[in-house]
A protein has these predicted regions:
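Residue-level signature of transmembrane alpha-helix interfaces in integral membrane proteins
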Residues: 24, 86, 139-141
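A conditional alpha-helix N-cap/helix-loop micro-motif detector
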Residues: 29-30, 104, 134-135
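Glycine-rich phosphate/adenosyl-contacting loop at the front of the ribokinase-like
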Residues: 1-72
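Conserved N-terminal subdomain of the carbohydrate kinase-like
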Residues: 46-126
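Short amphipathic alpha-helices and their capping/turn segments at secondary-structure boundaries
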Residues: 1-2, 108-115, 137-147
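Short C-terminal domain-edge/linker segments immediately following a structured domain
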Residues: 34-39, 80-81, 127, 150
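Short glycine-rich, flexible loops that bind phosphorylated cofactors or substrates
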Residues: 13, 104, 130-132
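Conserved beta-alpha-beta core of the PfkB/ribokinase-like small-molecule kinase fold
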Residues: 121-150
Length: 150
């Protein structure tokens, strides 16, 4: 079964303590869409991720990690207009830096290449339904998936 996932990807910087109490962070791939696709691929499934990253070192690193983990990254979009989101986590603390970032700027015009007809399932996170271009992309993607019978 092939799955098309519309979701977010961000660089997650994890620490064992609260961010203000540590000097060391571990960089990981974060975001519901990225996590879902990585796990689905690890179980032997085919998962394509439709998301947008900044055309920056963080975005390129995350795309390379996703591809290495077996995720189909052919639908990833990159933009120079916004940076890749970053989230700091540690000791029951989450500090998201998502406002005005690439993931939320993904718009409906970027859905044209999404292969809804070739997918067995379409999944998304309700977190993408915030007031942003990403919300409009979700609404159009849901209509396209319904029309394709996905």
């Amino acid at each position: 079964m092939s799955v098309l996932c519309l979701g977010e990807v961000w660089l997650e910087l994890n620490a064992a303590a609260a961010p203000e109490l540590t000097e060391t962070f571990r960089a990981q791939t974060g975001g519901w869409g990225a996590g879902f696709c990585r796990q689905y691929a690890a179980l032997g499934g085919q998962a394509a991720l439709l998301a947008q990253l900044g055309a920056d070192p963080f975005g390129r690193k995350l795309a390379a990690r996703l591809a290495r983990d077996g995720v189909d990254c052919s639908l990833l979009c990159f933009t120079d207009a916004f940076p890749t989101p970053v989230v700091f986590t540690g000791a029951d603390t989450a500090l998201p830096y998502r406002a005005h970032t690439a993931g939320l700027a993904l718009g409906p015009e970027q859905l044209e290449t999404a292969p809804f007809r070739g997918s067995s399932a379409f999944c998304f996170s309700s977190a993408g339904l915030v007031d942003s271009p990403l919300r409009l992309a979700h609404l159009e993607a849901l209509a396209a998936a319904r029309d394709a019978g996905t």
